[in-house]
């Protein structure tokens, strides 16, 4: 509760939750996916920032009886319109038929996995968490062999797909300088609950007073961009900077 904005009781076993971790000023430290493996066992599939040291610091300060560690887990994303059929051929009907934001603990050929119906794209997709780092080659070769006839190829996250889907990227689109209300993520904040968390008072104040800036989507006219921007672009109106573009 000290770290996560959404009530832990809202998270049911075998389900995922998109959550926010904020600092004392309400700034976003990370926006991980929370997976509840058991009543007292949770995973945070984090974005690109150091949450491990933050979580350990919170635990020490609060004197909580909790163990925080980085497990032997290697994530692999399987995204795209044919991902369900590939997953079905690779691991069977049960993981392939998972509902959105559900996950299952699964063993394939003696290899322990966690498979979730999540992903960082606007497409149908899954995330496969390998729980044995020594089996990475076997898992990779199996999925690629099954997926090859369906056009599966290795790649990286498509910036345009996640931008079009309004999926924010930590560091690029948000940092601790941004709060959930500015980012349009107020649906993830529960400020009127009885439980406490880091940043609660600051977020209550921000909610009451309102924000002075907002994160919005823009459409840019002209020729298509050759690639993504490497730095933030200033938005000028009447020779005055009124904002900036984070991702394009």
Regions found by a protein language model. Name each.
Residues 3, 21, 234-237:
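Hydrophobic beta-strand positions
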Residues 1-12:
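Single conserved hydrophobic/aromatic residue that forms the stacking wall/gate
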Residues 2-4, 26, 212, 227:
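Residue-level preference for beta-strand/loop junctions
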Residues 24-32:
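Gly/Ser-rich phosphate-binding catalytic loop and adjacent alpha/beta segment
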Residues 34-248:
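Conserved, structured C-terminal
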Residues 13-21, 100-102:
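A short, Trp-centered hydrophobic/proline-enriched beta-strand micro-motif
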């Amino acid at each position: 509760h000290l770290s996560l904005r959404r009530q832990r009781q809202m998270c049911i076993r075998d389900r995922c939750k998109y959550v926010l971790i904020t600092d004392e000023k309400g700034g976003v430290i990370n926006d991980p996916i929370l997976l509840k493996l058991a009543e007292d066992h949770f995973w945070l599939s984090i974005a690109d920032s150091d949450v491990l040291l933050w979580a350990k610091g919170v635990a020490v300060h609060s004197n909580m009886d909790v163990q925080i560690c980085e497990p032997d887990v290697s994530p692999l994303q399987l995204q795209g319109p044919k991902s369900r059929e590939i997953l079905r051929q690779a691991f069977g009907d049960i993981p392939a038929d998972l509902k959105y934001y559900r996950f299952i603990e699964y063993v394939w050929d003696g290899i322990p996995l966690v498979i979730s119906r999540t992903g960082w794209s606007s497409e149908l997709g899954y995330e496969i968490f390998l729980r044995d780092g020594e089996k990475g080659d076997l898992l990779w070769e199996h999925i690629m062999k099954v997926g090859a006839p369906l056009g599966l190829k290795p790649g990286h996250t498509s910036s345009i797909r996640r931008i079009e889907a309004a999926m924010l990227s930590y560091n690029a689109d948000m940092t601790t300088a941004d709060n959930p209300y500015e980012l349009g993520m107020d649906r993830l904040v529960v400020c009127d609950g009885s439980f406490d968390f880091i940043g609660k008072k600051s977020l209550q104040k921000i909610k009451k007073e309102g924000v002075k800036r907002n994160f919005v989507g823009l459409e840019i006219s002209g020729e298509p961009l050759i690639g993504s921007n490497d730095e933030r672009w200033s938005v000028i109106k009447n020779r005055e900077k009124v904002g900036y573009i984070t991702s394009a």
